[in-house]
From Swiss-Prot:
This is RNA-free ribonuclease P. SUPFAM superfamilies: PIN domain-like. It catalyses: Endonucleolytic cleavage of RNA, removing 5'-extranucleotides from tRNA precursor. Belongs to the HARP family. InterPro entries: PIN-like_dom_sf, RNA_free_RNase_P. Pfam families: PIN_5 (PF08745). HAMAP family: RNA_free_RNase_P. Keywords: Endonuclease, Hydrolase, Nuclease, tRNA processing. It comes from the Archaea. One of its GO terms (biological process) is tRNA 5'-leader removal. One of its GO terms (molecular function) is ribonuclease P activity. The lineage of its organism: Archaea, Methanobacteriati, Methanobacteriota, Thermococci, Thermococcales.
Length: 198
């Protein structure tokens, strides 16, 4: 069994609380499960995701376990084939988001014309809503795309709380687990696999 891990497990406060109060504690808890599952379950991170996580944790507290239990591997981008429908879906999704972002901007302009004393607040609201319209539910970084490609290459399960990653995993037929239940999954695996030689 193979898992490809996203940063949300260790960094997103809503998800991380299942593993620890801060990113380092969350990683320590995860590594304790990885140690019990060593040789039976593999945990991967693309290099970009690994670097991202390392910005949030105290690496000195986590070595050598983090190097032993998390396999850093980039996807083989020169060999992987992506179905054409993915490109069609992406183009259509981007077009919808641009239109939605335009409507958000138009609404903000109308509000600013009516309420000229409150322009700064309207701009903040515009930025927040524009960002939500364009980025929520889409793969919006190279690191997110690497995560999906690596899971596809390895026939692994993605672990993430990112709606965009999970949406595209579903579209591409990739197995996934929401980060919010990952600790329960690990506990179940430890219970099932303890003492078994797989």
């Amino acid at each position: 069994m193979k898992f490809v891990l996203d940063t949300s497990i260790f960094v997103n406060p809503e998800v991380r609380k299942n593993f620890g109060d801060n990113p380092t504690e969350a990683m320590k808890t995860f590594l304790s499960y990885a140690e019990k599952l060593f040789g039976k379950v593999e945990f991967y991170m693309p290099p970009g995701i690994y670097r991202e996580v390392m910005h949030f944790v105290d690496s000195e507290e986590l070595r050598p376990a983090i190097e032993l239990y998390i396999i850093k591997k980039p996807p083989n981008v020169h060999e992987l084939k992506i179905p054409a429908f993915v490109v069609y879906e992406l183009i259509e999704d981007i077009r919808r988001r641009i239109d939605k972002g335009l409507r958000v901007a138009e609404k903000a302009v109308r509000e600013s014309v009516l309420d000229t004393d409150n322009v700064d607040n309207i701009i903040q609201k515009l930025r927040r809503n524009y960002r939500r319209a364009l980025r929520e539910g889409i793969v919006d970084s190279k690191e997110d795309f690497e995560l999906i490609l690596l899971a596809m290459e390895l026939d692994a399960t993605i672990v993430s709380a990112d709606v965009g990653i999970l949406t595209w995993a579903q579209k591409m037929g990739i197995k996934w687990v929401d980060s919010s239940v990952f600790r329960e999954v690990l506990e179940g695996l430890v219970e099932k696999l303890e003492g078994k030689n797989l």
